[in-house]
Amino acid sequence: MSANWKTTGKTTGELSFEISQDEIKKSLDKAFGRVKKSLRVPGFRKGHVSRVIFNQYYGEEALYEDALNFALPEAYSAAVKETGIKAVGQPQIVPVSMGKNKAWEMKAIVTVEPEVELGQYTEIEVPKQNTRVYQKDIDAELTKRQEQNAEMVLKNDKAENGDTVTIDYVGTVDGVEFDGGSAQNYSLELGSNTFIPGFEDQLVGHGAGEEVDVVVTFPEDYGAKDLAGKEAHFATKIHEVKAKQLPELDDEFAKDVDDSVETLDELKEKIKAELKSEKEEAAKAAIQEAAITTAVKNATVEEIPDVMIQEDVDNQLNQYLGDMQRQGIDPQTYFKLTNTTEDQLRSQLSANAAERVKTNLVLEAIVAKEGFEASKEEIDAEIKDLADNYNMSEKAVRNALSDEMLAHDINVRKAMDLITDSAKQVAKAKLEEGSEEDK
């Protein structure tokens, strides 16, 4: 194939290429095979017209459009590969010449990825992370586990934040009851902020047997539009008040909450190890984010084409909705419950799309510069991990994702690891001093 690339802008150009006579013949055969079944020519049974007779009646040119549709995808892909351009989006392809017994000449208006000039991406200075576990961290986790295993006991005193009250309530707006505004024997933890702002606060200081007229105003962005911004009265009766009774911190408690330990000291050591692991993971994530952000900032990227930004938003949206469905959540039900729309979600995803695209371009440029290449073993391991994570068969993963796509993800992770692992943690003061010098 003879292909030629001519740059016409920072991210646009013209790709000239040919479709060979051999490929044209194959595509004409496919096109004839498709139309033959429905052909009607006087003197011939339907679907039994020869190619010669077809050409006599209609001319071979009648097959050109279908033949071109068959031939173009492969010919265009081959031209892109031959010229080495990084095409994005859909090209605008225009036939230049389509004659008999010669190659067909094509011209495509193509958008390509912008050029990337890398800056420093290794040994980047990032804020030092503290992964030390303090006694207060362990104590807080123990308290959390006490609360999770607390018993609820009746109290005769007035309700306080943290107590749970059992109530009946009837809500009205302008003296009229509304749907969903009434309940009986409802358990509500005061301070949980599960009800309309102000509702729970007005029950604090009241005890069992009391009736309280709770007056609140629905938020302006409340899901039910007919109630948004309106004042409501809730005739509320408190049946009982219960308080949390925390279990004693002793060896028995330790064994109750974790059957892998025998004593409270062992539980504390296990909690310390778990918190240490969590802090180290959080530290690595923070280092990675800071280092990659700086590496991207250090790079120079030409103007990003709109088509790349829209493709990113489409991919993010499809992934978001796909994750919902895999969790058994119907997207339309989700939008209804959250009082949002797909367009609003798309708008949210668009906010950082350009930065996401720039980050991907920089990471891909690092992959190319470092010469990262995923091995067959790495691709096989990636397929196994994806199959396990999404509860799919490995065959299904292979059918859904090409080796090229999998290798791309593996290599990008290698670039991210290179940036992260080579980063240097320094004190915040030193970083601020360096930023002052850069001004």
From Swiss-Prot:
EC number(s) given by UniProt: 5.2.1.8
A cellular-component GO term for this protein: cytoplasm
Residue ranges constituting the PPIase FKBP-type domain according to the UniProt record: 162-247
Enzyme class, spelled out: isomerase
Entries under Gene3D superfamilies matching the protein: 3.10.50.40, Trigger factor ribosome-binding domain, Trigger factor, C-terminal domain
GO biological process: 'de novo' cotranslational protein folding; cell division; chaperone-mediated protein folding; protein transport; protein unfolding
Reactions performed catalytically: [protein]-peptidylproline (omega=180) = [protein]-peptidylproline (omega=0)
UniProt keyword terms in alphabetical order: Cell cycle, Cell division, Chaperone, Cytoplasm, Isomerase, Rotamase
InterPro entries documented for this protein: PPIase_dom_sf, PPIase_FKBP_dom, Trig_fac, Trigger_fac_C, Trigger_fac_C_sf, Trigger_fac_ribosome-bd_bac, Trigger_fac_ribosome-bd_sf, Trigger_fact/SurA_dom_sf
Localisation: Cytoplasm
Function: Involved in protein export. Acts as a chaperone by maintaining the newly synthesized protein in an open conformation. Functions as a peptidyl-prolyl cis-trans isomerase.
HAMAP family tied to this protein: Trigger_factor_Tig
Domain notes: Consists of 3 domains; the N-terminus binds the ribosome, the middle domain has PPIase activity, while the C-terminus has intrinsic chaperone activity on its own.
Protein name: Trigger factor
Native source species: Lactobacillus delbrueckii subsp. bulgaricus (strain ATCC 11842 / DSM 20081 / BCRC 10696 / JCM 1002 / NBRC 13953 / NCIMB 11778 / NCTC 12712 / WDCM 00102 / Lb 14)
Highest classification ranks of the organism: Bacteria, Bacillati, Bacillota, Bacilli, Lactobacillales
Gene this protein is translated from: tig
